[in-house]
Amino acid sequence: MSTTNAINGNLYEQLHQGRTNMYKSKVDVVLGAQWGDEGKGKVVDMLASEVDIVCRCQGGNNAGHTVVANGTEFDFHLLPSGVVNEKCISVIGNGVVIHLPSLFDEVLKNEAKGLQHLEHRLIISDRAHLVFDFHQHVDGMQEAEKGGKSLGTTKKGIGPAYSSKATRNGIRVGELLGDFNAFSDKFKLIVATHLRLFPSINVDVEAELTRYRDYAEKVRPYVKDTICFLHTALRNGKTILVEGANAAMLDIDFGTYPYVTSSNCSIGGVLTGLGLPPQTIGEVIGVVKAYTTRVGDGPFPSEQLNEIGDLLQTRGFEVGVTTKRKRRCGWLDIPLLRYTSLVNGYTCICLTKLDILDTLPEIKVAVSYKKANGDKLDHFPGTIAELGNIEVEYAVLPGWQTSTEHIRNFKELPENAQHYVRFLEKELSVPVRWVGVGKGRESIINVH
């Protein structure tokens, strides 16, 4: 037995020796740590000024990111926020689902605001799946059928498109650019499948095919094998930043299922959505809003259905970029953040919208969950039934009641504001590297 153990031990040691690394650079990742709307776009915009490539890896135009650059506010849904940096290549990866009409509408709207030369610096994966109009119709119908138990979907067709992908009758961008007769046959087949399930949807097949023949030529200049492109970039030492869409608590596996999106918006989705191996990942930046918000239905332990929630909603202008719905608001939730940090492995935190708390005399932070019988939970609940029955315990921290909006040095923040940041660091055992106190990239304070 001891000989076998010794042999196995030596083999295991050998497994970890002599590793070679073909890559000269790493991929840094920006992920939402709550239920979205944390300010990821602003963080990406800040970092994109120093990187070569910015990528989207999952989701579709159900995501909404706002970036303020040189006084102009840009809204992005499919485009990576890094497109505002003209020196940067933007990549839409294979894990993204793309509604081409929405993509080109977004391009036109942002070009009107001054975005230029996208045709030279936007690359779309040939393996990304297409979202069709009938996917959007089905999304709305499925949501309506749920009645009072709706999931709060954006009705952008994202779920049905991922369903088509999973059942292997979806259509990829590369297929649109290949033999158009083969694309037409496949399109007719997927429409017929949906009509059997949803006979009330109306699809003019010939009109759609005419439309997509035009889209094929329009999108063709942007399409590449992004997997080879990214691996070549890494071998050549190019810096790559990934912008996660949605957020950890909306992840199809790790979020508050079924009140989630249809993709993996945690670290695993970065690997599968871009074709990257784990060893390429460098920094994992968790973006945390200084309080918690959620759009749509689903459990929300620290939600404040009172004047505090109203104040946070009003001061934070908490309205969804994509849905235009008011966001639900509540206190910062440490157990939730510990959980998403476990899943994602944050190496640092960017804390955003600290200035929204400026007027409060005291600030509560959710620090633990208790079961109905009073026992403390040592894990994040895996079902919405369990999550709905917990009691939240809060720590009460002193507010600072001073404007932080124009402060640009961490040491100049009010002492209680600094304490709030350090409290989060201590509870998560993850350093807070940046603090946001306003809209533009210039309002992000470097802590260290």
From Swiss-Prot:
Sequence positions that bind substrate: V321, T322, T323, K324, R325, K326, R327
Protein residues bound to Mg(2+): D37, G64
Alphabetized UniProt keyword annotations: Cytoplasm, GTP-binding, Ligase, Magnesium, Metal-binding, Nucleotide-binding, Purine biosynthesis
A single Gene Ontology CC term: cytoplasm
Pathway membership: Purine metabolism; AMP biosynthesis via de novo pathway; AMP from IMP: step 1/2
Biological-process GO terms, alphabetical: 'de novo' AMP biosynthetic process; IMP metabolic process
Enzyme class: ligase
Short name of one Pfam family: Adenylsucc_synt
Listed Gene3D superfamilies: Adenylosuccinate Synthetase, subunit A, domain 1, Adenylosuccinate Synthetase, subunit A, domain 2, Adenylosuccinate Synthetase, subunit A, domain 3
Cofactor binding description: Binds 1 Mg(2+) ion per subunit.
Binding site for GTP: 36-42, 64-66, 327, 353-355, 436-438
Positions bound to IMP: D37, E38, G39, K40, N62, A63, G64, H65, T154, R168, N246, T261, R325
The enzyme's E.C. designation: 6.3.4.4
Main location: cytoplasm
Active site annotation, chain numbering: D37 (proton acceptor), H65 (proton donor)
Compartments where located: Cytoplasm
Reactions performed catalytically: IMP + L-aspartate + GTP = N(6)-(1,2-dicarboxyethyl)-AMP + GDP + phosphate + 2 H(+)
InterPro entries on file: Adenylosuccin_syn_GTP-bd (IPR018220), Adenylosuccin_syn_Lys_AS (IPR033128), Adenylosuccinate_synth_dom1 (IPR042109), Adenylosuccinate_synth_dom2 (IPR042110), Adenylosuccinate_synth_dom3 (IPR042111), Adenylosuccinate_synthetase (IPR001114), P-loop_NTPase (IPR027417)
GO molecular function: adenylosuccinate synthase activity; GTP binding; magnesium ion binding
Cofactor: Mg(2+)
UniProt KW Cell inner membrane keyword: no
Biological role stated in the UniProt entry: Plays an important role in the de novo pathway and in the salvage pathway of purine nucleotide biosynthesis. Catalyzes the first committed step in the biosynthesis of AMP from IMP.
Membership in a protein family: Belongs to the adenylosuccinate synthetase family.
PANTHER family xref list: ADENYLOSUCCINATE SYNTHETASE (PTHR11846:SF0)
Subunit structure: Homodimer.
Name assigned to this protein: Adenylosuccinate synthetase
Origin species: Drosophila persimilis (Fruit fly)
Upper classification of the organism: Eukaryota, Metazoa, Ecdysozoa, Arthropoda, Hexapoda
